[in-house]
């Protein structure tokens, strides 16, 4: 099959401090990732790549366009970008469903609309930034009872706040990451089991709790000799030790539906020492 993949990139300065950018591209992929889950309370993923064929695994086709405007002056960078993406040829096997569509095999497309916004400021030894992302991501599988519904990765809002301070040989950083919860599918309350199977609500009609994580780190550079330098660093992941649920699914156990939650790491210190010859 003959495939054309055009690209478009236009940048234009607007005065001294503004710039507008328009991007567009077509892409294709001849392999698709198949995700299978161990059918128990562990829910362990088994991933493999499979070549596209003429039957149940089509060639993935991506169409994407974006338009952005940025402002840069006196250490300030302010940027906003809107984008649209449509991906045809995705399969249910590749999306990691753990609900009523876990064992369904069909193909469809994914539409994503979003906006990214960032503000960054450099001031003396400080470099600080704030970013916000909005996204609306939907699946369409025409062979499913619900043709269109939110995608498994439809994280509607995300905020990142960070700063670092550098003085001499020492660099100290801190960051905050927050996002609204991932979509999830819950059983029908009061009628959780029907015909021996879990009776689910509409696909991805609920969300997990919001995700919040604070990290800090410090890195010190020094010399061991004229020809050898070293880096000594310490970092703490999830400083507040917050319990963040990153996935939730359901299984039948002793004729009752049980929820299985997967949590991210709690407070996790790390220490590094690197020698450069």
Residue ranges, per PLM feature:
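Transmembrane beta-barrel architecture of outer-membrane proteins
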Residues: 2-6, 24-28, 61-65, 73, ...
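Surface-exposed extracellular loop regions of Gram-negative outer-membrane beta-barrel proteins
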Residues: 16-65, 82-102, 175-196, 242-247
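Short loop/turn motifs that connect adjacent beta-strands in outer-membrane beta-barrel proteins
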Residues: 17, 75, 125, 169, ...
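Transmembrane beta-barrel strands of outer-membrane/channel proteins
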Residues: 22-26, 69-71, 80-84, 130-134, ...
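Outer membrane beta-barrel strand-and-loop segments of large Gram-negative receptors
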Residues: 54, 58, 64, 77-131, ...
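Gram-negative outer-membrane beta-barrel transporters
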Residues: 84-86, 105-188
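C-terminal beta-signal and adjacent terminal beta-strands/loops
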Residues: 88, 178-194, 212-213, 218-277
């Amino acid at each position: 099959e003959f495939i054309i993949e055009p690209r478009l990139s236009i940048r234009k300065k607007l005065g001294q401090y503004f710039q507008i950018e328009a991007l567009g591209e077509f892409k294709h992929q001849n392999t698709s990732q198949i995700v299978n889950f161990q059918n128990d309370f562990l829910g362990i993923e088994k991933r493999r790549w499979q070549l596209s064929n003429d039957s149940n695994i089509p060639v993935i086709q991506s169409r994407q366009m974006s338009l952005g405007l940025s402002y840069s002056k006196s250490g300030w960078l302010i940027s906003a970008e809107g984008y649209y993406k449509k991906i045809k040829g995705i399969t249910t096997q590749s999306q990691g469903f753990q609900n009523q569509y876990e064992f369904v095999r069909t193909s469809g497309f994914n539409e994503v609309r979003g906006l990214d916004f960032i503000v960054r400021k450099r001031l003396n030894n400080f470099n600080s930034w704030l970013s916000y992302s909005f996204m609306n991501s939907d699946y369409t599988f025409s062979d499913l009872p619900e043709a269109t519904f939110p995608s498994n990765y439809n994280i509607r809002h995300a905020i990142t706040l960070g700063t670092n301070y550098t003085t001499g040989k020492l660099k100290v950083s801190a960051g905050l990451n927050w996002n609204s919860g991932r979509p999830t599918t819950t059983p029908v309350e009061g009628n959780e089991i029907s015909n021996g199977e879990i009776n689910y609500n509409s696909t991805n009609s609920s969300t997990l709790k919001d995700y919040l994580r604070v990290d800090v780190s410090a890195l010190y550079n020094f010399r061991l000799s004229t020809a050898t330098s070293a880096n000594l660093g310490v970092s703490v992941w999830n400083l507040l030790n917050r319990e963040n649920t990153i996935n939730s699914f359901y299984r039948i156990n002793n004729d009752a539906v049980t929820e299985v939650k997967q949590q991210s790491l709690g407070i996790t210190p790390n220490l590094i020492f690197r020698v450069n010859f």
